[in-house]
C-alpha cells in the first residue's frame, strides 16, 4: 500500500464524516484502509478513495467500475453504480462530501498534540506566487502541504487538505472566490490560524459588481479565522487595511513605506530591479532588523508577495536572515507566472516571458511593467512585443478596461502589441479588438498594433515580428480562455 497522505480512516468513519450510506460490502469496514483521496481516476493508487464528480465534460461516475482494479478502497458517489467492484458510499452531493471529508481530516489532525498551523491566503492577485514562496520557506521548518498550481476552490482546497497527515506541520491554503460566500464556505471546511489578505483588485468585477463587494468576499477569510487567529494585511491597499476592523485578535501589517506614522511589521526598502526584472530590496522588520533579498523570480510586483510570505514565516519563528536567503533561493514557481525561457523556431528565436496563467487589469499592468524593465539599461535595447489575451469577468466597464490596458502597453514601451481574441467567442474577440484600439490610439506606428483572432494567428504575427527584429522579447499574458498558456507550452516544448 502507498504511504499515507491523509489521516488513515475506515470506511465506516468516512461514511459518518460525509453523512453517506455505505453500501453492503464484503471488505472490512472498521479498519483504517483509506489513506488518500482523489477526484481524478488516473491518480488512484492502493488505499485511495475515489470521489466521483460530474463535471461539464466528464462524469467521474463513469470511471467507478475501473478504480477497484487500481487499488481504490472506496468510491464516493451520488448514486450506486451497478456492478462496480469497489465499496461505495452514496451521498447527496459528492462535491460537498469531498469538503466534509477534508474538514474531518483537518479536525483529526488538530486533535493530535503536535503543532499544526493552517495559513489561509486570499487576494485578487498574487495568491499562488505567495503560496509558492511561503511553502518554500515553511518547508525548511517542517513538513508543509500546499496546493499544486492554484487549487483554491471548493474542490481544490479539500483535495489539498486531504494531503494533511500526522506528520504535517503546516498547511498553506489558497482561497479564491468568484462570488460572495465562497471563501466563507472554504473557511468553514478549513478554518485558518493565520489569514493573509494581499490585494483587492478588479479581478471578477463582473461577478461581484463592485470593488466593495470584492473586499467583502475577501474579508470572509478574516471572519473565518479560528478564535484568536492572526490577521496579516497589506497596509498599502485601503480595502485590505479596512479589514483590521473585523480581525478577531492581533493584526500584522506588511507593505512599502508610504507614511512616516505607518506601523509596518514587515517592509521592503531600496527596491530595485535588474535588467532581467529580478527585484532586490532590504527586508526589514518592526524592530529594525534587516537583511538583503534578491528574488530569483521576475516582477517588481512580487516584492509585495514576498513581504506577505516573509511576515508569515517570521511570525512562525524563522529568523530574518533565513527568510531573506530562503526568498532569494526560490527561482521557479507555479507554471505560466513570469517564467523566462528562450524559444527557438526554424525562422527565428526570441526570449519569452510567460505570464499566461490568467489576467486582470492589475496583473496585466504588472506584467507590462516587467516587459518595459527587461534590459532597460542595455545599450542595444530589445524589441519588446506584448501578446495580450482578453480578460474576463470585468463587468460593464470591460471594453474601457481593455482599451486602457492596450494604451498602457504602448505608452509603457511595448514596440509591438498583439491582442488575442477568439474565433469561437465573439465577446472575447470584441474585447481583444478594444484592447488593440486602445493601443492604436497612442501608437506612433499603428501597424505595430495587431489584432489576432486566435492563438494560432498570434503565433504567426509574433514569428514575423521576431524574424524582422533581432533581440526580441515577448510577454505572453491573458485569461485562460484566450489559449495563450497552450501557446506558451507549444513554444517552450519546441
Predicted regions and their residues:
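Phosphate-binding loop of NTP-binding sites
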Residues: 15, 97-235, 239-247, 468, ...
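Extended acidic/charged loop-beta regions that coordinate divalent cations
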Residues: 27, 164, 175-205, 241-290, ...
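A short helix->loop->beta-strand "cap" motif at the edges of active sites that frequently abuts
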Residues: 70-73, 86, 225-230, 247-250, ...
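Short, basic phosphate-binding NTP loop
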Residues: 2-122, 129-140, 337, 428, ...
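Residue-level signal for inorganic ion chemistry
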Residues: 14, 48, 67, 101, ...
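Short, polar loop motifs at secondary-structure junctions
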Residues: 75-82, 235-239, 256-258, 422, ...
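ATP-dependent carboxylate-amine ligase
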Residues: 1-19, 46-49, 59, 132, ...
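Short, conserved loop/helix-junction motifs that constitute active-site signature segments
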Residues: 69, 189-190, 222-227, 245-247, ...
